[in-house]
From Swiss-Prot:
Function: Catalyzes the transfer of the diacylglyceryl group from phosphatidylglycerol to the sulfhydryl group of the N-terminal cysteine of a prolipoprotein, the first step in the formation of mature lipoproteins.
PROSITE patterns, per database record: LGT
Pathway: Protein modification; lipoprotein biosynthesis (diacylglyceryl transfer)
Location of this chain's protein in the cell: Cell inner membrane
Family, as annotated: Belongs to the Lgt family.
Protein name per UniProt: Phosphatidylglycerol--prolipoprotein diacylglyceryl transferase
Segments forming a coiled coil: none
Lipid bilayer topology: Multi-pass membrane protein
Biological process per Gene Ontology, one example term: lipoprotein biosynthetic process
Gene that this sequence comes from: lgt
Cellular component, GO, one term: plasma membrane
Tagged with keyword Cell membrane: yes
EC number(s) from the headed UniProt entry: 2.5.1.145
GO molecular function terms noted in the UniProt entry: phosphatidylglycerol-prolipoprotein diacylglyceryl transferase activity
Length: 268
């Protein structure tokens, strides 16, 4: 059995002000995304934005992630609770963010920013997609430190007793998602960007691989208590929300493959 590290969710306290690791992980993900996107804007001749525009894009994306992630969590996962406890909607440090809601928020942010600078929406998505897994991985570390989004009870050697999860060992599902949705997905997308490739290949890969990784990792996560299993006595809300991403990613990849076969797909 693995040993839980017992990290205090509060990284720093200055009088009544508490700085949580959960928030710091989001800040780390946003900063790393800004740094790598700015680097890519300098070295990629096809970049749809200039290096000096990356700061503004990061601001748009950060708002999309925070607002979309929180609103998505409230709507998709716990609407009745927040309906009766509206003040709790603003307690972000207690956790409660939805990737799928954040993804929708980022799409809206991309659309607004692309319109502002006169860029192509899909080119912007293709350009930013390789750095998104960094934020995903950082967020999962925040979930782990918070002791939330717990895994299922297990007798596997990978089990871990969480202080918030009772006396039985559970899968550290947050670390599984950190590895597959963060480390593996970033590595794959970054390697693909090193060489010339068909336009929108990375965008399609991101959507398909993230949706697939999330769908599989959900089998190790405890279902959300307010929903449990929604279909077939095994499908969770996270899996349901991942299916559209898998399908849309597959459609993009098929379209890229067809255009490549016909020599009509531009390489970048």
């Amino acid at each position: 059995m693995l040993q839980y590290p017992h990290i205090n969710p509060v990284a720093l306290q200055l009088g009544p002000i508490k700085i949580h690791w959960y928030g710091l992980m989001y800040l780390l993900g946003i900063f790393a995304g800004w740094y790598l996107t700015r680097y890519r804007a300098k070295v990629k001749p096809w970049a749809p934005i200039k290096p000096e525009q990356v700061g503004d894009l990061t601001f748009y994306v950060a708002l999309g992630v925070i607002l979309g992630g929180r609103i998505g969590y409230i709507i998709f996962y716990n609407l009745p609770y927040y309906f009766h406890n509206p003040s709790q909607m603003f307690f972000l440090w207690d956790g409660g963010m939805s990737f799928h809601g954040g993804f929708i928020g980022v799409l809206i942010a991309f659309a607004l920013f692309a319109r502002k600078i006169g860029a192509n929406f899909f080119d912007l998505g293709e350009f930013v997609a390789p750095v998104i897994p960094i934020g995903l991985g950082a967020g999962r570390i925040g979930n782990f430190i918070n002791g939330e989004l717990l895994g299922k009870v297990t007798d596997s050697p990978l089990g871990m007793v969480f202080p918030t999860g009772g006396p039985l060992p559970r899968y550290p599902s947050q670390l599984f998602e950190f590895f597959f949705e963060g480390v593996v997905l970033f590595s794959v997308l970054w390697l693909v960007t090193i060489k010339k490739r068909p336009r929108y290949l990375v965008l399609g890969l991101f959507m398909f691989l993230y949706g697939y990784a999330r769908f599989i990792c959900e089998f190790f996560r405890q279902p959300d208590p307010q929903y449990g299993y929604i279909f077939f006595n095994w499908m969770t809300m996270g899996q349901i929300l991942s299916i559209p991403m898998i399908l849309l990613g597959a459609v993009i990849l098929i379209a890229v493959f067809i255009k490549t076969r016909k020599n009509k797909c531009e390489n970048i």
